[in-house]
Each structure stands twice: as structure tokens, then as C-alpha cells.
From Swiss-Prot:
Coiled-coil segments on the chain, per record: none
Gene Ontology CC: one annotated term: cytoplasm
Organism: Mesorhizobium japonicum (strain LMG 29417 / CECT 9101 / MAFF 303099) (Mesorhizobium loti (strain MAFF 303099))
Family note: Belongs to the GroES chaperonin family.
Subcellular location field: Cytoplasm
Keywords: Chaperone, Cytoplasm
UniProt GO molecular function: ATP binding; metal ion binding; protein folding chaperone; protein-folding chaperone binding; unfolded protein binding
Subunit details: Heptamer of 7 subunits arranged in a ring. Interacts with the chaperonin GroEL.
SMART domains hit by this protein: Cpn10 (SM00883)
Name of this protein: Co-chaperonin GroES 2
Gene: groES2
Length: 104
């Protein structure tokens, strides 16, 4: 089954956080917070402005995003837990930058 978001909605898969702290302490499931980072799976066509013109979304499928703790609606699709949210719930896109090694 496929899912196509409408308007300015996006479909997001949460990216699970680390299960250990930097000091090596394992965090139990009961103490974990929901991750606020995810990967965009699908996007809608965009929102319409006052004149009726379609405004495309800034995010695209494959983007890694940050969103609020209580953003979106949780759904289960093909046995996978996903989120549907409006683009306005997205705080920003995480861009992967290539690390540049400096010569010593």
C-alpha cells in the first residue's frame, strides 16, 4: 500500500536516537524520549496562497529534518510507525556536509 500526502503535509519516519550516552550508560526504554529527528518519506504537492497559486514545499523526500516533540499525527502504515505533519511543523533540514581533511 502506498500513501500520498495532500496539500502541505509530509510523511516522516522517525530516526531512532542512540541507546547509550557518551559515557557508555545504556538508556532504558522507559527513560527514552521520542526522537525529534526524521527522514521525509513522501510530500504533498504544496499549499495554495490567497490567489489560489500552488506554492511548492521546501522539503523533499529523503531530507533529514528536525521537528517539535509533539508534532504530527502518528500512523501505522505497512507495519511501520510513521508521522504525518504539516511542513510548518518542521524546524529545519539537517544537511550532511562532507568533512574536509586538512593536511598537517
Amino acid at each position: 500500500m502506498t500513501f500520498r500526502p495532500l496539500h502541505d503535509r509530509i510523511l516522516v519516519r522517525r530516526i531512532e536516537a542512540e541507546e547509550k550516552t557518551a559515557g557508555g550508560i545504556i538508556i532504558p526504554d522507559t527513560a527514552k524520549e521520542k526522537p525529534q529527528e526524521g527522514e521525509v518519506i513522501a510530500i504533498g504537492p504544496g499549499a495554495r496562497d490567497e490567489s489560489g497559486k500552488l506554492t511548492p514545499l521546501d522539503v523533499k523526500a529523503g531530507d533529514r529534518i528536525l521537528f517539535g516533540k509533539w508534532s504530527g499525527t502518528e500512523i501505522k502504515l505497512n507495519g511501520e510507525d510513521l508521522l504525518i505533519m504539516k511542513e510548518s511543523d518542521v524546524m529545519g533540514v539537517i544537511e550532511q556536509t562532507a568533512t574536509v581533511k586538512k593536511a598537517a
